[in-house]
Structure formats: C-alpha cells, structure tokens
Amino acid sequence: MNKHERLDEIAKLVNKKGTIRTNEIVEGLNVSDMTVRRDLIELENKGILTKIHGGARSNSTFQYKEISHKEKHTRQIAEKRFIARKAASLIEDGDTLFFGPGTTVELLAEEVNHHTLTIITNCLPVYKILLEKQTAHFRVYLIGGEMRHITEAFVGEMANAMLEKLRFSKMFFSSNAVNKGAVMTSTLDEAYTQQLALSNSIEKYLLIDHTKVGKEDFTSFCQLNELTAVVMDYEDEEKVETIKTYIEVVD
C-alpha cells in the first residue's frame, strides 16, 4: 500500500467511524505508530479530520458551525429537488400542513400545486413562496415569534404558544443531521419548536439528502422510529439502507 492509498484508507476509516484511535489504524493497516501520526497531521492539514488525544475525529461527522442559508442553497440542489418532488406527491387536497424551515422544504413549497390546502409554517422564506399561491381555498399562515436569522425561522415562546393550539394532518420538515436514529438540529429553541409541531401532527415526514446521514449536531429533537417516513435521495444506497433499519423510506 503506497502513501496515497494509505491516506485514502485512513480518511475512509475516520469518516465511517466518526472517531478512531491511532492504534486501530496501526493494527488495521499494519504500519508504524510514527507513520500514522504523520499521516494524521497531513490529513488534518487538508481539512479531512481533526487530531484528538490518541486518535482523530472526522470533520464531516459533527457540524461545528451551522451553514448559512445562502450557502445551503448551493449544496445538493439536484438531490433536494428530487426529494421535494417526491414529498409533494404525498400531499392531498384538503390537507392541513405544517412546513418546517430548511432549503429542501422551500423547494417543496415551490412544488406544491394543489387547489385546496391550509399550510402553516414558521419559516419566512417558505411563507414567501407559498404566499404567491394563496387563494380563497389555498390558505397560508406564518407563525411569528423570535427569528433565527441563519434559518429565518421563528422560534421562542410566542411561536410555541401559537403552535400548541394547532393540529396538522401532515408535517414536512428537514434537519441538519441524522445519526443512530436521532434527528438533530443546531439550537434548543429550534428543537423545541419542531418537537411541538411534531407532537401535533398525524403524519410526519423528514426530508433529508444523503449527506445528512451519519452526521451529528448540537441537539436531537426526535427519533426516526417516531416518524411516518423519510423522503431522501438514492445517491448513497448504503445510507438509504441505514435509514431503512429505523423507518420506511418513500420510494
């Protein structure tokens, strides 16, 4: 195994496991401790991992800095549009829906083309898209409160007080990360608001692209097995199969 193959193998191992011990790499690749330490330094300099005491941690596992709303609109757009179209097919005339924040949900809002719907959202960009479609039979409501500027979603006591009184036939939402059956986001405020909407929804659909699977974020707000189904792309079959061990994935 040459150096480039070894670096590639170490990167695959740390990304798969999240964190890895130096001695695991030494034994797995049959190389010296000093060689592994040099390789870890090189991979850290490339931004692939972060060295920790006795090993390394994948930089793709934990989302230390939440990505801006603008940047999210440049990532996995084809996959997100595919997910949005599949999610739209689950909506029926007469539904009362809750749309959570997120760029994938914004794309779902663009796809919605029904005659009779009531849609409630706490996300300003989602509301703006839906407002253009409003008619006497297609009603759109925005939940107010304290706005998180990075997601342009309303959270906090005012938003939660309104949500507590509402009931939804279906909820469509996204998340920053899904790992070991837990669905995660970046703040406690947003997590609690999502939990309230979930508890008041009959059917619950999580919209995620494959890059979110195996990552972690600050706090979890639900478990996959509490949901109706997950809507995702099929770019990584292994990740799809991972999700299927917890919950149905919409075909």
UniProtKB/Swiss-Prot annotation:
Disulfide bonds: none annotated. It comes from the Bacteria. Keywords: DNA-binding, Lactose metabolism, Repressor, Transcription, Transcription regulation. GO terms for biological process: lactose metabolic process. InterPro entries: Carb_Metab_HTH_regulators (IPR050313), DeoR-like_C (IPR014036), DeoR_HTH (IPR001034), NagB/RpiA_transferase-like (IPR037171), Tscrpt_reg_HTH_DeoR_CS (IPR018356), WH-like_DNA-bd_sf (IPR036388), WH_DNA-bd_sf (IPR036390). The keyword Cell division does not apply. Coiled coil: none annotated. PROSITE patterns: HTH_DEOR_1, HTH_DEOR_2. Residues 20-39 bind DNA. Residues 3-58 form the HTH deoR-type domain. The keyword Signal does not apply. One of its GO terms (molecular function) is DNA-binding transcription factor activity. Repressor of the lactose catabolism operon. Galactose-6-phosphate is the inducer. This is Lactose phosphotransferase system repressor. The lineage of its organism: Bacteria, Bacillati, Bacillota, Bacilli, Bacillales.
